[in-house]
């Protein structure tokens, strides 16, 4: 029997590619994918659950890249921000939250304004609007008079023009308490994560009340933006025209109710003057108390909810076993194969290498469905022979799927198919075993049955494919993947990894 300790493994995480039989709007089924066809026919594979309770999210909640990579790396179900926060929401514990209360007491003491900012969306990927509504309730119960809400439009994790219902719910509660909707910005500006600070600063300026784009009410604002073919994600940072509205100024305090950190850090940096980035705003502001819903890595804030700690992810177990490791992705997903795969910690292991292939800086990946996939495969072919465990990410199906352009998403899947054929061919020639999975669904539902674009993630299962034809795999969930790989390598998993291997023996 071959000594598995000499085996090398490449784990490919495809971003945003689920399994669905229906062809309507299904870029995966409609694409020409000769290599995928070959793999599903000739290689062992199984179904993997990547959403809802299987990844520590509420029942039926679609998966996402952060949660997916956390679960893959941890080898256990990771109860993330949404689940943790929802528990307190259901138990009406927001009113007892120490961080919230510290902010509120400071606002009362200084007769300042509390600013609530974040993605107002039912999506549950970066935020959940119900959290905002509960915080508003708490602010009122605690006697705050001056509360301003700064709305970030979604249109990416939910339908492109779906914010109307969120505004209706928000207006009902702000009118009830005489609070204000002070500014509106699309997440394209307020939640950039690619260090394009020209975008972030436009959202920042709107928070301070500096914008030439103004609105009298949200309904008029929506009509104007939509008439210019601007969807929720791309709302021009705009401010309430009323002279009575309080914008962010020195001495005020902020609660940023986004729980996911990656798209919250740049704007937070500008507001509190952190040292995380070099970019500084032209008009800095002094915030008294800044509370983030969860920890934003690299930035010091009050933290409302502490995340579950992952102490022994696959990277650490592999390091202790003496394995050389390679992590590889393009800019858009680099944090996912490093920070999130390692349990929400930025760590470089001994005998490891990280390679980030630069993502193209474009307005829409619909026009560039190739993204940087070729560069990722090229780097893998150059480097993987020197490493025992390689973990990489292909971003195409997710990032192009988010555009809702079916033809482009089909092209993205076809490009991925070709790059996987190159990767597996290289691996087989060098006695490296490949495992291929995905972190969540997306590209398999790019349009609905009426042809309307669908840009959000899905709750469909994904695949786990292996190039080792001697294996048999059973169905499972993302948290089973690390135990499966360690089992294949004859490495004992850590006791924290309480999920089993999917290899049938």
Curated annotation (Swiss-Prot):
Mn(2+) 1 binds at residues 398, 402, 457. The keyword Metal-binding applies. It comes from the Bacteria. It holds the Pfam family Metalloenzyme. InterPro entries: Alkaline_phosphatase_core_sf, BPG-indep_PGM_N, Metalloenzyme, PGAM_B_sf, Pgm_bpd_ind. Mn(2+) 2 binds at residues 15, 65, 439-440. GO terms for biological process: glucose catabolic process; glycolytic process. One of its GO terms (cellular component) is cytosol. Substrate binds at residues 126, 156-157, 187, 193, 260-263, 333. Pathway: Carbohydrate degradation; glycolysis; pyruvate from D-glyceraldehyde 3-phosphate: step 3/5. GO terms for molecular function: manganese ion binding; phosphoglycerate mutase activity. Its cofactor is Mn(2+). Keywords: Glycolysis, Isomerase, Manganese, Metal-binding. It catalyses: (2R)-2-phosphoglycerate = (2R)-3-phosphoglycerate. Its EC number is 5.4.2.12. Transmembrane segments: none annotated. The active site is at 65 (phosphoserine intermediate). Belongs to the BPG-independent phosphoglycerate mutase family. Catalyzes the interconversion of 2-phosphoglycerate and 3-phosphoglycerate. HAMAP family: GpmI (MF_01038). This is 2,3-bisphosphoglycerate-independent phosphoglycerate mutase. The lineage of its organism: Bacteria, Bacillati, Mycoplasmatota, Mycoplasmoidales, Metamycoplasmataceae.
């Amino acid at each position: 029997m071959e000594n598995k300790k000499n085996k090398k493994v490449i784990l490919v995480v495809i971003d945003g590619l689920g399994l669905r039989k229906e062809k309507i709007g299904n870029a995966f089924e409609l694409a020409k994918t000769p290599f995928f066809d070959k793999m599903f026919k000739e290689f062992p594979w199984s179904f993997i659950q990547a959403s809802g309770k299987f990844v520590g999210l509420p029942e039926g909640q679609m998966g996402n890249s952060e949660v997916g990579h956390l679960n893959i790396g941890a080898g256990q179900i990771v109860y993330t921000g949404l689940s943790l926060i929802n528990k307190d929401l259901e138990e009406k514990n927001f009113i007892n939250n120490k961080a919230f209360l510290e902010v509120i007491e400071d606002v009362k003491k200084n007769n300042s304004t509390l600013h609530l900012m974040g993605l107002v969306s039912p999506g549950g990927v970066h935020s959940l609007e119900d959290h905002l509504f509960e915080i508003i309730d708490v602010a009122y119960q605690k006697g705050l008079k001056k509360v301003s809400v700064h709305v970030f439009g979604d249109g990416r994790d939910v339908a492109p023009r779906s914010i109307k219902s969120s505004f209706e719910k928000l207006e009902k509660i702000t009118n009830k308490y005489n609070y204000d909707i002070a500014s509106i910005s699309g997440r394209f500006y307020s939640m950039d994560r690619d260090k394009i600070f020209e975008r972030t600063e436009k959202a920042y300026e709107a928070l301070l009340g500096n914008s030439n784009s103004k609105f009298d009410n949200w309904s008029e604002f929506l009509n104007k933006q939509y008439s210019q073919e601007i969807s929720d994600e791309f709302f021009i940072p705009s401010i309430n025209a009323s002279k009575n509205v309080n914008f962010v100024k020195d001495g005020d305090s902020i609660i940023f109710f986004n729980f996911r950190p990656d798209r919250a850090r740049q704007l937070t940096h500008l507001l509190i003057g952190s040292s995380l980035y070099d970019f500084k705003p032209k008009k800095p502001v002094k915030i008294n108390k800044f509370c983030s819903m969860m920890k934003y890595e690299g930035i010091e804030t009050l933290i409302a909810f502490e995340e579950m700690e992952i102490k022994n992810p696959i990277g650490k177990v592999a390091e202790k076993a003496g394995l050389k490791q390679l992590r590889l992705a393009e800019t858009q997903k680099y944090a996912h194969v490093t920070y999130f795969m390692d349990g929400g910690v930025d760590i470089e292991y001994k005998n490891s290498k990280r390679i980030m292939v630069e993502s193209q800086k474009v307005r829409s990946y619909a026009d560039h469905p190739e993204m940087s996939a070729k560069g990722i495969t090229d780097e893998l072919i150059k480097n993987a022979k020197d490493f025992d465990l390689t973990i990489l990410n292909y971003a195409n199906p997710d990032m192009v799927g988010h555009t809702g352009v079916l033809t482009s998403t089909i092209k993205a899947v076809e490009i991925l198919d070709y790059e996987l054929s190159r990767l597996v061919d290289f691996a087989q020639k060098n006695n490296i075993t490949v495992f291929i999975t995905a972190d969540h669904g997306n590209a398999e539902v790019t349009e609905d049955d009426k042809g309307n674009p669908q840009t959000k993630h899905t709750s469909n299962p994904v695949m786990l494919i292996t190039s080792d034809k001697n294996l048999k795999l059973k169905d499972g969930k993302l948290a089973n993947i690390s135990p499966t790989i360690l089992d294949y390598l004859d490495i004992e998993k850590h006791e924290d990894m309480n999920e089993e291997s999917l290899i049938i023996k």
